[in-house]
From Swiss-Prot:
Molecular function GO labels: structural constituent of ribosome
GO CC, alphabetical: cytosolic large ribosomal subunit
Pfam families tied to this protein: Ribosomal_L35p
Protein name according to UniProt: Large ribosomal subunit protein bL35
Lineage, broadest ranks: Bacteria, Pseudomonadati, Pseudomonadota, Alphaproteobacteria, Hyphomicrobiales
Organism annotation: Bartonella tribocorum (strain CIP 105476 / IBS 506)
Keywords of the record: Ribonucleoprotein, Ribosomal protein
Signal peptide: none
Gene3D superfamilies for this protein: 4.10.410.60
Family (UniProt): Belongs to the bacterial ribosomal protein bL35 family.
GO-annotated biological processes: translation
Length: 67
């Protein structure tokens, strides 16, 4: 059976760190920022690390070979 391919959309959205954690951009920034608090906007600026349960699902389904 051939190797499972990495999903192209996942390559653009997720980055795997050296320790195996998965970094993603913070959600909720596409529109409607005018009514958000300054703290929300500031916190959503950077990236975040997925929890272990979500990271396991992402690796299993979308990034079988890593990046």
């Amino acid at each position: 059976m051939p190797k499972m391919k990495t999903k192209s959309s996942a390559k653009k959205r997720f980055k795997v760190t050296a320790s195996g954690k998965i970094k993603v951009a913070a959600a909720g920034k596409r529109h409607g920022m005018i009514k958000r608090s300054n703290k929300f906007i500031r916190d959503a600026r950077g990236t975040m690390v997925l929890c272990e349960q979500d990271a396991k699902k992402v690796i299993q389904h979308y990034l079988p070979n890593g990046l």
